[in-house]
Regions:
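Short glycine-rich or small-residue beta-strand-to-loop segments that form or flank ligand, phosphate
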Residues: 87-93, 233-236, 412, 551
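Conserved phosphate/anionic-ligand binding catalytic regions in large, soluble enzymes, centered on
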Residues: 40-60, 145-148, 234, 238-250, ...
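Phosphate-binding and adjacent anionic-ligand microenvironments
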Residues: 294, 298-300, 322-324, 342-538, ...
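Gly/Ser/Thr-enriched, mixed-charge loops and adjacent short helices
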Residues: 13, 35-40, 44, 153-285, ...
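An N-terminal, well-structured beta->alpha segment
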Residues: 4-105, 194-231
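N-terminal small/polar loop signature for handling phosphorylated ligands or for N-terminal nucleophile
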Residues: 89-152, 255-313
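Glycine-rich phosphate-binding loop plus the immediately following alpha-helix
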Residues: 158-188, 329-352, 357-366, 422, ...
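Short Gly/Thr/Asp-enriched flexible loops that form oxyanion-binding sites at enzyme active sites
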Residues: 101-109, 152-159, 309-329, 365
């Protein structure tokens, strides 16, 4: 019989399995029934980014016990696949408890007879993806909550191709985790014993050389960089995360000399003392970087999130002297067009090239891909599905991957890794900036040229945060309402068709014709609107949020902005 949240709480407070510090934290909650319920009403669940939750005691929190339990389920699955000798690579970011969680995961795997390769200190998430492939591991783990607030941590699982887990592995691992119902089923061992048995292995700094070498291979015109380096000023902040060493190293080795790092944010620190939310998508994270940019008169300003898989960009508009914030769509399309154009020019474009993006990423990608005779493949939200496509291309030979991007500031050039990679994005964007600087243009000038050529595409995102069990239920109710009462019009836009990825149906509202979406089942609703507009609704896979995405195509930037605002208003008013 399943215990209720109260019984589970009492068990955690009294069972000798749990340490005294955990018990004390929980006893201090006595009388706060809502907090107790929130900590114990469910197990943390996998979403698009794996396991993620607030750090603390409880089944619905990130702690050594939930990490071990998750890892035991993973271990059982690996053993069923006979993957124990291949082993598991493990990395972590700068967050509170990240090193401890990484070590606990390793020792749980070791106790199950599975080899582990743990990075000796914090590393970017994409380097872990590369390590899984390079070391021939069956799986990988990254302890990170990416760009979430400081109270959070998380646990992402990768499979042997180096991408985050997708079907069938994600469902199968979940099923194994669900079977670990008693903590007595969870194995662990002492580090000394694990080392003595050759199970607990450390990855040192020499491995970084291999990773950096892969990044540098993606450069198309390295010869331009030394020529422009002295005139190009770059401001960079790692936002207290893992990006500082690899980003600065790859820029230095390519020949960029004018790189200014935000001193106050250089050191890894899981409390993120200078930012409330260490996310390059949040303008509040840019205060110190923009201050430094103005002091040194920087050409471009860059920020990576704590696990260095996302890149944010600001660039100077020389006409006004102001810095313009680029969305992930804008920076991604600048890199994408540069790669497609220059690889075509230099004769290095593979046969049947493909650009891969998520369904909520800009429609400009379709126009750019068409210009360079490149297939555009759309996948569900989450970079793991882009990684999955690369594997599919490898297996079938249908296409050759050239570049992949998502609107949420993530992209990947090359196939050495299978997750979004901020160090390679920094490197490519700085090369793009040097290329245009040689022509007397800024990145903003280049972006305006793209708008002129392909159309004024503009995208937006509105997010509603609803925490706790009440929030979870409200989000479900909102999705149910959209399904039961599908809109025929959103603002000034007629709905031409809608896609319900959960039900695997696309319905044309004019003809009533239905067809498959062609993508896996996911709790996502997508509305195709007239005039090249669209919007999409989905609950976040990693946070207590519901997200509304919008996209339009205008005749000018002003026209696109007006259309976007109208769509945003219509969609969020329906929600309210």
């Amino acid at each position: 019989m399943t215990m209720g949240y109260r019984e589970t709480y009492e068990m955690w407070c009294t069972d000798p399995y749990f340490d005294d510090k955990t018990k004390e934290e929980l006893r201090n909650l006595a009388g706060d029934e809502k907090e107790i319920e929130d900590r114990f009403y469910r197990q943390l669940e996998f979403g698009t980014g794996g396991l993620r939750g607030m750090i603390g005691a409880g089944t619905n929190r990130m702690n050594i016990y939930t990490v071990r339990q998750e890892t035991q389920g993973l271990a059982n699955y690996i053993l069923a696949q006979n993957g124990q000798d291949k082993g598991v690579a493990i990395a972590h970011d700068s967050r509170i408890m990240s090193p401890e969680f990484a070590r606990e995961a390793a020792l749980c795997l070791n106790a199950n007879g599975i080899k582990t390769y743990l990075f000796e200190s914090l590393r970017p998430t994409p380097e872990l993806s590369f390590a899984v492939r390079e070391l021939g591991c069956i799986s990988g783990i990254v302890i990170t909550a990416s760009h979430n607030p400081r109270e959070y941590n998380g646990y992402k699982v990768y499979w042997e191709d180096g991408a985050q887990i997708t079907p069938p592995h994600d469902k199968n691992i979940l099923a194994e985790v669900a079977k670990v119902t008693e903590f007595s089923m969870v194995k662990t061992m002492e580090e000394d014993a694990a080392r003595a048995e050759g199970l607990f292995n450390i990855i040192g700094t020499d491995f970084d050389d291999k990773y950096i070498a892969q990044l540098k291979k993606q450069s198309i015109h390295p010869e331009i960089i030394p020529e422009m380096a002295k005139d190009m000023k770059i401001v960079y902040t790692p936002l207290h995360g893992t990006g500082n060493i690899p980003v600065r190293r790859v820029l230095r080795e390519l020949g960029f000399t004018q790189v200014y790092v935000v001193e106050e944010q250089k050191k890894p620190d899981g409390t993120f003392p200078t930012v409330p939310y260490p996310n390059p998508e949040d303008e509040n994270a840019w205060t110190l970087a923009m201050k430094l940019a103005k002091e040194v008169d920087a050409d471009i300003v860059l920020a990576t999130d704590p696990d260095a898989d996302r890149l944010g960009v600001h660039t100077k508009d020389t006409k006004t002297g102001e810095y313009i914030s680029f969305t992930g769509n804008m920076s991604g399309m600048l890199i994408a067009e540069y790669i497609l154009r220059e690889r075509t020019k230099t004769g290095t474009m593979p046969e049947n090239p493909a650009l891969v993006e998520t369904i909520v990423t800009t429609d400009m990608a379709k126009a750019v891909a068409a210009e360079y005779n490149t297939a555009l493949i759309e996948v569900l939200t989450g970079f793991k599905y882009i990684g999955e496509q690369i594997r599919h291309f490898d297996e079938t030979g249908a296409h050759h991957y050239v570049f992949g991007l998502e609107e949420s500031y993530g992209c990947l050039a090359g196939t050495y890794a299978r997750d979004k990679d901020a160090p390679v994005a920094v490197m490519m964007l700085c090369e793009v900036a040097a290329y245009y600087k040689k022509q007397g243009k800024t990145l903003w000038d280049a972006m305006l040229d793209m708008y002129e050529k392909y159309g004024y595409y503009k995208e937006g995102l509105a997010t509603v945060t609803l925490k706790g069990i009440d929030g979870f239920q409200k989000i479900q109710a909102m999705m149910d309402d959209f399904r039961q009462n599908p809109p025929k019009k959103l603002g000034d836009f007629e709905v031409l068709a809608y896609r319900d990825y959960k039900e695997d149906v696309r319905k044309d509202l004019a003809t009533g014709k239905t067809e498959s979406t062609g993508l896996p089942a996911s709790n996502v609703l997508y509305y195709e609107l007239e005039d090249n507009a669209w919007c999409c609704v989905r609950p976040s896979g990693t946070e207590p949020k519901i997200k509304f995405y919008f996209g339009v195509k205008g005749t000018s930037l002003e026209d696109a902005s007006e259309k976007l605002e109208g769509l945003r208003k219509a969609m969020t008013e329906k929600e309210a």
